């Protein structure tokens, strides 16, 4: 969900990053994206993201049958392109990198690629 002014978009999101070894990671974020005007159906974009990420873990070896959670500040970058279809519809493809925070002295990163279809109001 977001808002667009000129070539700049601002969006909020919820992301479930997954679960690994009893640790579930999810986040609430905000992104600022810039759309390059190419005067064609293809519109490249770049952006940055900040998020608060919750690391929720259960049944850790040193604390059997206990659960806890930590909140970490994260950041990321995104790049991609939109392809104008019909009317307000568009196809979208992009890549992203998110630094989710440190967990037990380990840097936790998320890389991804996305494709989708959108509708602009």
UniProtKB/Swiss-Prot annotation:
Query: Mind telling me which GO cellular component terms the entry cites?
Result: cell outer membrane
Q: Which GO terms describe its molecular function?
A: porin activity
Q: Which InterPro entries match?
A: OMP/PagP_b-brl (IPR011250), Porin_opacity (IPR003394)
Supply the Pfam families for this chain.
Opacity
Sorted alphabetically, which SUPFAM superfamilies does this protein's record hold? Answer: OMPA-like (SSF56925)
Family classification: Belongs to the opacity porin family.
What name goes with this protein?
Answer: Protein opa
Its gene? Answer: opa
């Amino acid at each position: 969900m977001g808002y667009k002014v000129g070539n700049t978009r601002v969006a909020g999101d919820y992301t479930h990053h997954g679960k690994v070894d009893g640790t579930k990671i999810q986040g609430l974020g905000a992104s600022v994206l810039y759309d390059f005007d190419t005067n064609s159906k293809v519109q490249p974009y770049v952006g940055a993201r900040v998020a608060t990420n919750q690391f929720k873990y259960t049944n850790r070896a040193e604390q059997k049958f206990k659960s806890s959670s930590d909140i970490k500040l994260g950041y990321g970058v995104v790049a991609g392109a939109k392809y104008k279809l019909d009317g307000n519809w568009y196809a979208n493809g992009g890549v992203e990198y998110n630094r989710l925070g440190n967990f037990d002295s380990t840097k936790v990163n998320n890389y991804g690629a996305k494709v989708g279809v959108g509708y602009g109001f």
